[in-house]
Curated annotation (Swiss-Prot):
Organism for this UniProt entry: Macrococcus caseolyticus (strain JCSC5402) (Macrococcoides caseolyticum)
Positions annotated to bind Zn(2+) 2: 139, 174, 378
InterPro entries attached to this UniProt entry: ArgE/DapE_CS (IPR001261), Bact_exopeptidase_dim_dom (IPR036264), Peptidase_M20 (IPR002933), Peptidase_M20_dimer (IPR011650), Peptidase_M20B (IPR010161)
Stated name of the protein: Peptidase T
GO BP terms, alphabetized: peptide catabolic process; proteolysis
GO cellular component, one term: cytosol
Record note on cofactor: Binds 2 Zn(2+) ions per subunit.
UniProt entry tagged with the keyword Lyase: no
Amino acid sequence: MKEKLIDRLTSYVVIDTQSDASSTTTPSTDKQWNLLNQLKQEIEQLGLETDIDEYGYLFATLPSNTNKDVPVIGLLAHVDTATDFTGTNVNPQIIQSYDGNDITLKSGLKIETAKFPELSLYKGHTLITTDGTTLLGADNKAGIAEIMTAIEYLIAHPEIKHGKIRFGFTPDEEIGRGPHKFDVERFACDFAYTIDGGRRGELQYESFNAAGVNVTFNGVNVHPGSAKDKMVNALNLAVRFQSSLPANEVPEHTEGYEGFFHLMELNGNVERAQLSYIIRDHSREQFEARKVKMHEIITSIQNEYGEQAAHIEINDQYYNMGEKITPHPQLIDIPLEVMKSLNIEPIVEPIRGGTDGSQLSYMGLPTPNLFTGGENYHGPYEYVSVDDMERAVMNIVGILQKFEEKA
């Protein structure tokens, strides 16, 4: 199985599939079609029917092999890779029996144990790394390889009973648009799992509540030599707004269930300044309070300088999927049971981010997130354990089998 996983993952990551937030199409980049079309061919070679729509949502079915009435379970992964670092000309490196020391990549870049102490978990494992010049794309191509390998394994082992399985590969997750054209009725599942986590054992069913914020300040630009009581400096208004937010409630000072305000971009001059933020919080109450806080600061500036001086636009992006998943405890209990049977220590923690499951859960498809075995996503230090990819496959198989047993 390890060789199949290596072959699949290395063939997927060399295909550049980065998404593009500035694009208005779906997929946002044509190059995502290259991997989608390859996957369609691979699925058909397994003897399964596939269908892909105009937006690049590739769905397929493994029929049930039991007479029981089993919930239809979906498996999902995304084909696009992050825009944080280049994904062009990925050159994966395979390290057999990792010795536990610093890893020197071809570029000379080092994955140092002092900076990345989790490397100690992988001594003796087969690792796949970058060459130091690109990201790897294990997020989420490791998940794709694991789904494909799990489906192939079930076909080869008909003695493992399971219900109807739907699986799919989707575009544009990394830019937050993965579910925007996702047809839940066409996917036709009771529940689903994204295979989009990281370290072995991760099981995630809580995500942030998320919003995007755009703030604009309009100043009055007057020659500084005669500006008294006339000039309104938009940059100073921007500074006032930012300094009115809690200084410690930012990504670099928060963890776990703690939320934050994150200033993403600042542009401006005396006449006009624009700030872009994201708001994140696991608590819906605190999430709403953060939005109120921003509105209150804007109102105070408007009261002093006029309504035209400040404008804020807040758009909710997604909500904590835990609200939709916890009413279905089997979605959590079954993976926990399977992991323990595989001697995998579960890591149940909130996602400090979002997955496609965050939006899909609110579209009527409760979708927790399972581990893939990867680390340090979105940059040149990214790597994945093939040993843990194999465990991820058996975790998927075990979950599907357990749903059938409990039906």
